[in-house]
Design a protein with these regions (language model features):
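A short beta-strand-to-loop transition that corresponds to the Sensor-1 phosphate-sensing loop
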Residues: 21-25, 243-245, 357-360
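Conserved C-terminal RecA-like helicase domain
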Residues: 94-354
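Post-DEXD/H (motif II) to motif III coupling segment of the RecA-like Helicase ATP-binding lobe
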Residues: 2-62
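Short glycine-/acidic-enriched loop or helix-start segments at secondary-structure transitions
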Residues: 2-4, 29-31, 251-252, 298, ...
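Conserved catalytic network of the ASCE P-loop NTPase/AAA+ motor domain
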Residues: 10-16, 56-60, 231-234, 279-280, ...
Length: 446
């Protein structure tokens, strides 16, 4: 890695004076990475805020927007099924007299555990007391005082999840419980998808959260944003969609309406937007720029060849079922590195209003100051990577000093009346990712 070479260079040169300017400090990285950063650059002496950089003209004025969507009907059904399984399991365990016997055997109820040990996990202690209360069993006053709660809430799925996590995994030794009973209960929970990697999941399942993060409702969000931005900016629009996957299997769907393109990825986005553009009879032209596939409008062929010049060779071919007079697939002969700059050049000249690519472009040091709108259709939650992506849209452009930029973040949420009832950590993993992403952006608070 490049940083190893830099560290080695630093070791071998004496009396170095280092001036370090970092656009994106690794604030939310691992401790090891932060230590490495500090060893190389030294303590931070001054932090220049984004508003200061905008004021002095180093960055263009910009605005972040969060575009929320609800799950699709099918996704909502899957969420409901998970909730129903959790509720049914809670009710089943509440009726289980054997479970009650085992819970009452907990060492904390017979004074065998110290206060400090019991308070290591107050939420778990609360779940034990709430369970006893729900079974109309007197709660030891010492434990309730220890918890500092005059009144305990009713038993629900959240408290059952905490109780089962301790009973089945984290606090096994505190119970006088038959091993076979515990194994059968684990098998029962697993069969309902309520255990993932030795973690009881009755409120937030990784499988359900992944489905919501990848919600197909985000396709509609992207469609809405693209046509809204085009309505506002017309042919001056230079919109970049950054996502995580190419989805090459959708190449055969391009120009073939028999195929459904509801999926999150470069090629599904391209075809979805192209079809909608055709239906609306709009004049938006789209492009794709990835390491393994490049698509340009057919009328941009000559401009691309001029931009490439003598730096490389390319071939042009049909893409999917589209006519060669509509869009072209561009393939480099040999090393394709030169193609990125050439496509960026024709994008900046207006041969395309919307460019779709993967975040791997950032690793190639890619830049295009013409971008005036960015859709982050990526599941990156870290500040560092998010800021690198945002940075592509907030560059100043000397040819257009009046440039401003919009940055769009996509989040899938349950209907708002359900969100209001949920704890912050139960809203959705997608929402939590947005919070992590926004943590260090000045002025953005969610």
């Amino acid at each position: 890695e490049w940083w190893k070479a830099l560290e080695e260079f630093k070791k071998q040169v004496n009396n170095l004076k280092i001036i370090a300017l970092t656009a994106t400090p690794p604030y939310d990285s691992t401790p090891a990475m932060w230590t490495r950063y500090m060893n190389m650059c030294g303590e931070i002496d001054e932090e220049i805020t984004i508003p200061e950089l905008v004021k002095e003209g180093s960055l263009c004025p910009h605005q972040d927007y969060v575009y929320f969507n609800y799950p699709t009907k099918e996704e909502e059904k899957e969420v409901r099924r998970f909730e129903e399984r959790s509720k049914a399991m809670t009710e089943k365990i509440m009726r289980d007299t054997q479970f009650l016997t085992y819970v009452r055997s907990h060492k904390g109820f017979s004074g065998q555990l110290s206060d400090d040990l019991l308070l290591d996990n107050p939420a778990y202690l609360a779940s034990l007391l709430i369970y006893l209360q729900s079974k109309n069993i007197a709660i030891p006053s010492r434990l309730q005082r220890l918890l500092g709660a005059k009144k305990l809430p009713d038993m629900n799925v959240q408290w059952m999840e905490r109780l089962l996590q301790g009973f089945l995994y984290d606090d096994v030794d505190s119970y006088l419980c038959d091993k076979t009973y515990r194994e059968l209960l684990i098998a029962d929970l697993k069969s309902d998808g309520l255990i993932e990697k030795k973690k009881v999941v009755m409120t937030k399942s990784a499988a359900v959260e992944k489905m919501l993060t990848n919600s197909l409702g985000k396709c509609n969000s992207i469609r809405d944003i693209v046509f809204h931005e085009y309505e506002a900016s017309g042919q001056d629009l230079r919109l970049l969609v950054l996502t995580d996957y190419i989805r090459k299997e959708y190449e055969k769907a391009i120009g073939n309406t028999e195929y459904d393109v509801n999926s999150l990825g470069v090629l599904p986005f391209f075809e979805m937007l192209r079809r909608d553009n055709e239906k609306k009879n709009e004049q938006i032209r789209f492009g794709v720029l990835c390491g393994t596939i490049v698509i340009i409008p057919a009328e941009a062929r000559e401009a691309l060849e001029q931009a490439i010049g003598m730096s490389g060779k390319v071939t042009f071919s049909r893409i999917g079922n589209l006519s060669e007079t509509d869009y072209l697939k561009v393939t480099a002969v040999g090393n394709a590195h030169f193609l990125t700059g050439a496509v960026t050049d024709i994008f900046s000249k207006g041969y395309m209003q919307v460019l779709i690519g993967t975040k791997s472009l950032l690793g190639e040091g890619w830049d295009s100051p013409c971008i005036n709108s960015l859709i982050l259709a990526s599941f990156v939650g870290s500040f560092m990577l998010s800021n690198q992506m945002r940075g592509r849209a907030i560059r100043v452009m000397k040819e257009h000093p009046e440039k401003t930029s919009n940055i769009w973040h996509l989040v899938c949420l349950r209907p708002w009346n359900e969100v209001l009832k949920a704890d912050d950590n139960q809203i959705s993993e997608d929402y939590s990712m947005l919070e992590r992403r926004m943590e260090h952006f000045l002025g953005l608070h969610y």
